[in-house]
């Protein structure tokens, strides 16, 4: 058996040049111009067809969607609750009344959140009658004013520090928006401390009432300028208690069609947070 002769560098280079372009057959990278043209035409037609099919499919799907109201919505009829300011970790507010830097972030978050609720921002909103649903047929949907003074000590008007500098912090609670929701009865948000010997809770508006005039909600695109009703919970620690740590639970109450308890979702209609006031 004879060993295969090793090709010289010049021979290998010549073969590569011939592969890239063969002047005898006119081939480029092993294919003639006609062959390359047919391949490019095939892929152009093939991917053009796929793009057209995708575009047509998307167009058909978009025809089934409403531009103003989502076609598919959460099947849970009751809203959850959210709190502000945003806690730094695990729904826990830790601060020291004697150290402004410890609660500065909370105050800034509250001011930013309440900016749309100022009188100047609400001047184009409607003064709606209290106690009745604001059902509307369109095409123009009005948004009701939410007087910020209803939050009283937690409005930021009389106390720009929202009680944190006094050791009595405010936390705002709101319901999540659900399009078309019509609460029955007299909905309110009730906030209670786990240990009543440590602290008491003052809620604003009085009794945590949520006025029916803010319902139903018609969606972000239709209901321009809509403001969600708020309830403020102010934690007031007992002067006789040396412990300045309490867990507060807020839940929706007073409305038969709004749930605050569900076996599959323990947070439905309720929220719990902890307040820790350090010396």
Swiss-Prot record:
Task: Tell me the domain of life.
Answer: Eukaryota
Q: What is this protein called?
A: Sodium/potassium-transporting ATPase subunit beta-3
Task: Tell me the Pfam families matching this sequence.
Answer: Na_K-ATPase
Gene of origin? ATP1B3
Of the GO CC terms on this record, one is:
sodium:potassium-exchanging ATPase complex
Described by its record, this protein's role is as follows: This is the non-catalytic component of the active enzyme, which catalyzes the hydrolysis of ATP coupled with the exchange of Na(+) and K(+) ions across the plasma membrane. The exact function of the beta-3 subunit is not known.
Source organism of this protein record: Oryctolagus cuniculus (Rabbit)
Stretches the record annotates as immunoglobulin-like: 186-279
Q: Where in the cell is it found?
A: Apical cell membrane; Basolateral cell membrane; Melanosome
Subunit description = The sodium/potassium-transporting ATPase is composed of a catalytic alpha subunit, an auxiliary non-catalytic beta subunit and an additional regulatory subunit. Interacts with catalytic alpha subunit ATP12A.
Q: Which cysteines are joined by disulfide bonds?
A: 128-144, 154-170, 191-250
